[in-house]
């Protein structure tokens, strides 16, 4: 008889609230079986009693949950798999930021490199961070002696990558705010993250001219038909990983520019990102600064260099695909307007 599973990705709110919400779909099926507390059994043999809080047809792991989190050093970005054994008992498997199952005997701080998921779609994407999947227990990978584990060949070793089984289709991002045209005024209360050392000085026409030179050079006379062909070609490409599409505008192509990313994608996958990520085209990677703030994410430093070196211009469509490797990587597939002229 198949056993039900659900997974939870740990967010900052999970840590702050010191509790974990049980997925609604699981609750709707099994709430009558759950008592006032559950037993969480981890592969090291420890059994943790965690109290449940029930309200408005919702259930949280609460009393005792923080002690469980502390014991295994569970952090933001960790992935927890809960296999329901019946009678308010769960088997719990914990995967860390390097996508490996943790070493339960060292409080989760060390990798257990050989305990990886095989590349398989074990999860379904559900709304509100909830997921519930029912599979035979033989599908679920259990800890094995190192000598019995096959070599890591022919499949991705990223456990979390298997979580991303469906695309995120996003509309064209919010236009980049225009640069102020007035001279001699300093922007008050400016967000320090908006400041870029490569931006032009308003009181220097020569600098301002050079600032837009690169964008002008790549500004094309693109007909609506040509643009539509590139967009339609991009729409036929749907990676299995989460992705979004961006149609490049001149405002995304000058030195010092900022490009905002679709909010739906940002909220789901970029929350907490503040620093350099890797953007990959073909076999080469470029460092690009990505900042998430108040539900929005943007590219700044490094983005211009990426577009310049790859000769990306107005009207080109970029499909950004999230690869969950050890580093945070967005793989780019470019559909160029000049290929459809």
From Swiss-Prot:
Q: What is its main location?
A: nucleus
Q: In which tissues is it expressed?
A: Expressed in roots and at lower levels in aerial parts.
Q: What happens when the gene is disrupted?
A: Reduced vernalization response.
Where composition is biased (Basic residues), the residues are 179-188
Tell me, what does this protein do in biology? Answer: Essential protein. Involved in the regulation of vernalization. Acts as a transcriptional repressor of FLC, a major target of the vernalization pathway. Binds DNA in vitro in a non-sequence-specific manner.
Q: Where in the cell is it found?
A: Nucleus
Which UniProt key words apply to this protein?
DNA-binding, Nucleus, Repeat, Transcription, Transcription regulation
Q: Extra notes?
A: Lethal when expressed constitutively.
Q: Which residues bind DNA?
A: 5-98, 244-338
The protein's superkingdom reads Eukaryota
Task: Please give one Pfam family short name.
Answer: B3
- UniProt xrefs under InterPro entries: B3_DNA-bd, DNA-bd_pseudobarrel_sf, Plant_B3_domain
Region Disordered: start and end of each range?
166-223
Name the reported effect of residue 296 to E: Reduced ability to bind DNA. Lost ability to bind DNA
Q: Which GO terms describe its molecular function?
A: DNA binding; transcription cis-regulatory region binding
Task: Supply the CDD domains for this chain.
Answer: B3_DNA (cd10017)
Mutating residue 249 to E has which effect?
Answer: Reduced ability to bind DNA. Lost ability to bind DNA
- This chain belongs to the protein called B3 domain-containing transcription factor VRN1
Q: One biological process GO term for this chain?
A: regulation of flower development
**Can the keyword Transcription be found in this entry's annotation?**
yes
Q: Which organism is it from?
A: Arabidopsis thaliana (Mouse-ear cress)
Specify residue ranges for compositional bias: Basic and acidic residues.
200-211
Cellular component GO terms, alphabetical: nucleoplasm
């Amino acid at each position: 008889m198949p056993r039900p599973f659900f997974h939870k990705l740990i967010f900052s709110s999970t840590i702050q609230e010191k509790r974990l919400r049980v997925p609604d779909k699981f609750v709707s099926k099994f709430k009558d079986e759950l008592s006032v507390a559950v037993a969480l059994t981890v592969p090291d043999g420890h059994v943790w009693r965690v109290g449940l809080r029930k309200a408005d047809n919702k259930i949280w792991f609460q009393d005792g949950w923080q002690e469980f989190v502390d014991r295994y050093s569970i952090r933001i970005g960790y992935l927890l798999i809960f296999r329901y054994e019946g009678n308010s008992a769960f088997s719990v498997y914990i995967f860390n930021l390097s996508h490996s199952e943790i070493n339960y005997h060292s409080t989760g701080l060390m990798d257990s490199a050989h305990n990886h998921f095989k590349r398989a779609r074990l999860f379904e994407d559900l709304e509100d961070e909830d997921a519930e999947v029912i599979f035979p227990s033989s599908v679920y990978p259990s800890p094995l002696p190192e000598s019995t584990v096959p070599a890591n060949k022919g499949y991705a070793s990223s456990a979390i990558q298997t979580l991303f089984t469906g695309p995120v289709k996003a509309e064209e991002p919010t236009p980049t705010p225009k640069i102020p045209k007035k001279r001699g005024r300093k922007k008050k209360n400016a967000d320090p993250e908006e400041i870029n050392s490569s931006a032009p000085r308003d009181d220097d026409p020569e600098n301002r001219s050079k600032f837009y030179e690169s964008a002008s050079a790549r500004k094309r006379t693109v007909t609506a038909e040509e643009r539509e062909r590139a967009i339609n070609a991009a729409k036929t490409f749907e990676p299995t990983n989460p992705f979004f599409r961006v149609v490049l505008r001149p405002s995304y192509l000058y030195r010092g520019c900022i490009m905002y990313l679709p909010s739906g994608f940002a909220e789901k996958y970029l929350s907490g990102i503040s620093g350099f990520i890797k953007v990959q085209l073909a076999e080469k990677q470029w460092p690009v600064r990505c900042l998430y703030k108040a539900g929005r994410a943007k590219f700044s430093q490094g983005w211009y260099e990426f577009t310049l070196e790859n000769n990306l211009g107005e009207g080109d469509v970029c499909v950004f695909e999230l690869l969950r490797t050890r580093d945070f990587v967005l793989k780019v597939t470019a559909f160029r307007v000049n290929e459809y002229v």
